[in-house]
């Protein structure tokens, strides 16, 4: 077993403090509209330029193992906030440092760390309740655009794109961010259900220019096994041909005689048909086929359910107003499924998302929900250079998550103003705490609430304490607009923060800072001293 180095009490706390401070200093310079960039060296490719707190935090790794523990704990604050709300990572880091630094001063002066932590937790609950009270639901397209603009570092183009995407795909829709090939940042919206499986033969294409197969008022056959022989397949094909409607076939695979028959039918000008492979793999494939069946009002023909392809009839087929199949993907527009069945399916998927502990499963379930309920929007981020593109993509990601958070829990006056407005409520709560150290813990949170505003002001080249006093003396929604160096009504000016982001930042910061304050010992491996390299071999005495 490797020997360990143990630090106790004061020495341990100093090491943690140094680690916390080192990480926080690197992260907090990015806060606010006048926050600076951080350049991160990469082992391959160009350096990364970013203003995203969690990206900076993830790159910090300190040489001293004990200091690194403090840094890693604060890194956890940023990561947890990003996981919960998708934004607010820098605010969370600033709050964590403020709570820990002030708490450490009191622990050193003799306060009981456990009572301090209890006081911190009680104060955070009071502030979170107040945040929920003062938050305002998002009602307009304009407010969504404002939230996204602020989170994208005051980039109105990004803000408007995200608001447009949200409007088109709805609350449950999926917005994905990709890198574009050109300079322009554009929005593509895929309405209806889309999955990445294209036609099995180019002969199915109905438009030679776009190489797409477009089927209007189509029937949809959904089968969970391979189709290779024509014998079992022929009865349903004859029924469809008699109906005069085009047919989309979705199956695990279509090959051999079955595929050849369909292709020959198309070449000879028979009824319009297109065959695609089923999306997904394993159990996920089955679930997606069931989704398509519910969306189109058809049935999944499955031998597990006692159904056979040879017994299939028109009543089992789904229906869609339009189907567009390209070489790479398939889109089903306006499936004719029952609205109640579709809503029940969406609720079932939402429940699975809540119950799932795997991030990957949650992401895949969210994709299914989006495809069923709203559609998919893709924001393609373009820029002149790769470095600029990556920096811009970070901002688009932040803005997207902030917007989703705003729709979920409402909005607050931004720029750190909302936390300042919670100070009077917390001051009124203090006398209710009878334990002196708990009261000190609550006062630590009280003082920390002004830290984000002071940091935004400092990054704008102003004195944070003076700005704080000015904001405290003003009315509810008035705050400091660092971009214009003016005091204004933050809601009217469109300087907004999602309530979920502010709440998550405070909760994560207080949780980790409280744990650090109650830490009395640090255990780390003693780094092994590597032996000096062997001296170079002397020359063999031969001249060339």
UniProtKB/Swiss-Prot annotation:
Belongs to the chaperonin (HSP60) family. Together with its co-chaperonin GroES, plays an essential role in assisting protein folding. The GroEL-GroES system forms a nano-cage that allows encapsulation of the non-native substrate proteins and provides a physical environment optimized to promote and accelerate protein folding. NCBIfam families: GroEL, PRK00013.1, PRK12849.1, PRK12850.1, PRK12851.1. CDD domains: GroEL. Gene3D superfamilies: GroEL, GroEL-like equatorial domain, TCP-1-like chaperonin intermediate domain. Forms a cylinder of 14 subunits composed of two heptameric rings stacked back-to-back. Interacts with the co-chaperonin GroES. It is an enzyme of class 5 (isomerase). Induction: By stress. InterPro entries: Chaperonin_Cpn60_CS, Cpn60/GroEL, Cpn60/GroEL/TCP-1, GroEL-like_apical_dom_sf, GROEL-like_equatorial_sf, TCP-1-like_intermed_sf. It is found in: Cytoplasm. The gene is groEL. ATP binds at residues 30-33, 51, 87-91, 415, 481-483, 497. GO terms for molecular function: ATP binding; ATP-dependent protein folding chaperone; isomerase activity; unfolded protein binding. This is Chaperonin GroEL. GO terms for cellular component: cytoplasm. Its main location: cytoplasm. Its EC number is 5.6.1.7. Keywords: ATP-binding, Chaperone, Cytoplasm, Isomerase, Nucleotide-binding, Stress response. It catalyses: ATP + H2O + a folded polypeptide = ADP + phosphate + an unfolded polypeptide. GO terms for biological process: protein refolding. The keyword Kinase does not apply.
């Amino acid at each position: 077993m490797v020997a360990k180095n143990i630090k106790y009490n004061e020495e341990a706390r100093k090491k943690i403090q140094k680690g916390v401070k080192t990480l926080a200093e690197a992260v907090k310079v990015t806060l606010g509209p006048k926050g600076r960039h951080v350049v991160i060296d990469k082992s391959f490719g160009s350096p990364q330029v970013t203003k995203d707190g969690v990206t900076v935090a993830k790159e910090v790794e300190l040489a001293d193992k004990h200091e690194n523990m403090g840094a890693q704990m604060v890194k956890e604050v940023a990561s947890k906030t990003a996981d919960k709300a998708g934004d607010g990572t820098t605010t969370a880091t600033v709050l964590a440092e403020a709570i820990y630094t002030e708490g450490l001063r009191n622990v050193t002066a003799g306060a009981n760390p456990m009572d301090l932590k209890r006081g911190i937790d009680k104060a955070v609950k009071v502030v979170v309740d107040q945040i929920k009270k003062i938050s305002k639901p998002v009602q307009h397209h304009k407010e969504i655009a404002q939230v996204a603009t602020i989170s994208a570092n005051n980039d109105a183009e990004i803000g408007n794109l995200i608001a447009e995407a949200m409007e088109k795909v709805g609350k449950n829709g999926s917005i994905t961010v990709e890198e574009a090939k050109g300079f322009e940042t554009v929005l593509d919206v895929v309405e209806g259900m889309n999955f990445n499986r294209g036609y099995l033969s180019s002969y199915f294409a109905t438009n030679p220019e776009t190489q797409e197969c477009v089927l209007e008022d189509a029937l949809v056959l959904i089968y969970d096994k391979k189709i290779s022989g024509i014998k079992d397949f022929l009865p349903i094909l004859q029924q469809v041909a008699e109906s005069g409607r085009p047919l989309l076939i979705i199956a695990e695979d279509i090959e051999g005689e079955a595929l050849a028959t369909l292709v020959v039918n198309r070449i000879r000008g028979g009824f319009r048909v297109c065959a695609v492979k089923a999306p997904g793999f394993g159990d996920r494939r089955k679930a997606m086929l069931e989704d398509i069946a519910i969306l189109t009002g058809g049935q999944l023909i499955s031998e597990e359910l006692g159904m056979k392809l040879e017994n299939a009839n028109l009543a089992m087929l789904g229906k869609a107003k339009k189907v567009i199949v390209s070489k790479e993907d398939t889109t089903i527009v306006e499936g004719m499924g029952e609205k109640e069945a579709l809503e029940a399916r969406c609720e079932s998927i939402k429940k699975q998302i809540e119950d799932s502990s795997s991030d990957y499963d949650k992401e895949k379930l969210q994709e299914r929900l989006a495809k069923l309920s709203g559609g998919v929007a893709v924001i393609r981020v373009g820029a002149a250079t790769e470095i600029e593109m990556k920096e811009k993509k970070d901002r688009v990601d932040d803005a997207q998550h902030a917007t989703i958070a705003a729709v979920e829990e409402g909005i607050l006056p931004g720029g750190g103003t909302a936390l300042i407005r919670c100070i009077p409520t917390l001051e009124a709560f203090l006398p209710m705490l009878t334990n002196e150290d708990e009261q000190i813990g609550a006062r630590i949170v009280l003082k920390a609430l002004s830290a984000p505003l002071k940091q935004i002001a400092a990054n704008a080249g102003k004195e944070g304490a003076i700005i704080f006093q000015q904001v405290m003396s003003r009315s509810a929604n008035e705050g400091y607009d660092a971009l214009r160096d003016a005091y204004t009504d933050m809601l009217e000016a469109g300087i907004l923060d999602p309530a979920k982001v502010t709440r998550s930042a405070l909760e994560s910061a207080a949780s980790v800072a409280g744990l650090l304050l109650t830490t009395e010992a640090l255990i780390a491996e003693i780094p092994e001293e590597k032996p000096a390299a062997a001296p170079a071999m002397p020359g063999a005495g031969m001249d060339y």
